[in-house]
UniProtKB/Swiss-Prot annotation:
Protein name: Aspartate--tRNA ligase
Binding site for L-aspartate: E172, R218, H449, R490
Keyword entries, A-Z: Aminoacyl-tRNA synthetase, ATP-binding, Cytoplasm, Ligase, Nucleotide-binding, Protein biosynthesis
Signal peptide bounds: none
Residues bound to ATP: R218, D219, E220, Q227, E483, G535, L536, D537, R538
Catalytic activity annotation: tRNA(Asp) + L-aspartate + ATP = L-aspartyl-tRNA(Asp) + AMP + diphosphate
Disulfide bonds: none
Lineage top rank: taxon: Bacteria
Top-rank EC class of the record's enzyme: ligase
Function comment: Catalyzes the attachment of L-aspartate to tRNA(Asp) in a two-step reaction: L-aspartate is first activated by ATP to form Asp-AMP and then transferred to the acceptor end of tRNA(Asp).
InterPro entries in alphabetical order: Aa-tRNA-synt_II, aa-tRNA-synth_II, aa-tRNA-synth_II/BPL/LPL, Asp-tRNA-ligase_1, Asp-tRNA-ligase_1_N, Asp/Asn-tRNA-synth_IIb, AspRS_core, GAD-like_sf
GO terms under biological process: aspartyl-tRNA aminoacylation
GO molecular function: aspartate-tRNA ligase activity; ATP binding; nucleic acid binding
Lineage: Bacteria, Pseudomonadati, Pseudomonadota, Gammaproteobacteria, Pasteurellales
Amino acid sequence: MMRSHYCGALNRSHVGQTVTLSGWVHRVRNLGRFIFMQIRDREGIVQVFFDEKDEAIFKIASSLRSEACVQIQGEVIARDESQINKEMATGEIEVLVKNVVVYNNADVLPLDFNQNNTEEQRLKYRYLDLRRPEMAEKLKTRAKITSFVRRYMDDNGFLDIETPMLTKATPEGARDYLVPSRVHNGKFYALPQSPQLFKQLLMMSGFDRYYQIVKCFRDEDLRADRQPEFTQIDVETSFLTAEEVRELMENMIHGLWLDRLNVDLGKFPIMTWQEAMQRFGSDKPDLRNPLELVDVADILKDVEFKVFNEPANSADGRVTVLRVPNGASLTRKQIDEYTQFVGIYGAKGLAWAKINNVNAGMEGIQSPVAKFLNEEVFKALIERTNATSGDILFFGADKWQVVTDSMGALRLKVGRDLALTDLSAWKPLWVIDFPMFEKDDEGNLSAMHHPFTSPKNLTPEELAANPVNAVANAYDMVINGYEVGGGSVRIYDPKMQQTVFGILGINEQDQQEKFGFLLDALKFGTPPHAGLAFGLDRLTMLITGTENIRDVIAFPKTTAAACLMTEAPSFANPQALEELGIAVLKKEKAE
């Protein structure tokens, strides 16, 4: 027997028992007569000690380095009261070693387990990084999350059904990862960005409650919470309304937070996309932050200051104010830093006004734009924003999108900088009623979610007549400013689906070429259906309290979509490329 107990499972009830442990040497202290070691496995750490009286095993112990893989046999002993370590779960006991087997000693480590290592070091030697207790704990939590989800889905009548990994390239927003076919020369599979169409086809096949914990792939620019391959908790249902789907999924997340964190999330509030953008400058608002944007275009449309009056009188303009309580204490340097910050989002500047004394008229206001605004205007602004003495007002004035993006980002930054955001709180919500389409810089329409999302209460003819103002029957679950899941009611009428494709500029020939199988399937008694997908990586990131999604994935990629450990991607064998009919062209480096 290689193991009778996990290290972290030992406690006072095991005193007097002989145990067999297998794990790694975590730490060594040589005190001359005794050698103390901490032995670690995935469940925790326990202290063992070697007595010099047993010369043979004492000699072996003297040769062991940190991270050597060993088997320990010994007797569990209660520590003296003065020696109890309350910082360790196993701190009331230790193990007197009677025998030791060295499975493998360890070379000098390329990582220092007691210091912060660089991200590159951690990813290159990921198998060592994952031995660290804090990393092991995150992956254990991830496993428990998936276990909870599977139980919940099984209890609610969902079937776990797998969908293909090698599929057809369809336009879903990001670039596809392509896989060349050897048998069908010149043709390519795509790795799925999501199982979207297959799960809809399963609804058409009569499997009215489907789920899958599935890998998805997107060839897109990465950031801290994105990976080229990621895992979804994918869900689809037939004969359920959007409200019923949201209730089912809310109950699952509510139960998950209770199970993992003992936190009651309460009832999730529901907010429209329009309200979220107006009040918070984001479609995934962080409600832990009490700051809100207040629109003031009607107050500033007649002032003699073009920076304010032009966007205030423009159909695509916006003028808004962010009131920061006690913000009048901000220094000019801090304000300049915020001005630079909003510039990242396209803002040309950041006007501000300090309300030093709300009862002193213009004399109580300090602002570089005060000369353009009279006392009546400031009085209206103070009343609209509920400003009081000691507050500061930040102004955003430009095109609607620029103001919304820049002021929404400023709201988050100020909330964190000034400790206004309650980082200990959990604030979930549903965001609903998204626009069906969004315009790009050239005025072309694209689907805000995906082209299979149903509009809300519109016929195909009504949608075609006014697509810009169409509202999608879509919903996102947001927790603490992160979109953790998103879904919608799907189109189940072939005419509506063709109408949406047409609005997106997909002609009939391309519709048949790319989506002919779907359009055919829609003709044969397709049920109303709706679904949702959660990002498992992001859920785990939130529950474990990490801000880097790579910390909750066993073998993640870098932000350059590379694996430093295996050195993937790598060059392909020339013979394999020849069989595939592929020639690799070298790109000229830009000078």
